[in-house]
């Protein structure tokens, strides 16, 4: 009987490892705000290591790229992510992961919150785009930056005045610098309203409990001052989720943590 029990345990392990071996991890790897294209090398090292690990990777140009900044509303970005996921499945991916750098992080969270069961893990790298803190004039900034807060208030007034779909200049803040962004008031609010799905603290509690999340933040990233409580602690508990601090800034975090990210994905994305 003892031999039979050992045999059955070994057989179960063999079947489990065989099932895992048949799984194929597919990754949608999303750049940050005004990134993407040949000018942006922030994700190249991570991209290469994912491919070397046998993952299927799509690294698309998103609506907030340097060339498209910012095209359409938040819903358009979600639709594009869905299309990329479908392409991964068509090429053999059985487990889908969303990996986002900076603004790619709230996009990944938002898609997973809106589409339970569609993704199996999330990796948020140097998360950025923070409508809640924009609405507070970025309290951890060395100087008060109220440009987005004021622009959101103006955009709301434009919507109320019947000008929701008129394109005009609004304000964005990217790594401490204010910059104009040409959008309709309606579209702008989907990205910058602190109550919108572009705000990570809004979508984090809506993530399915079975979806593990990796949060990677550099020790020289301004957002590290807000710690785990801003978003990570709002996620449903999952034993595979991890909050990882690395010696990096906002732009270098994905490359510095590339090996750790890939190793985490190989474990967390599989059943």
PLM features: what roles do these ranges have?
Residues 242-271:
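Catalytic active-site module of serine/aspartate enzymes centered on a nucleophile-bearing elbow/loop
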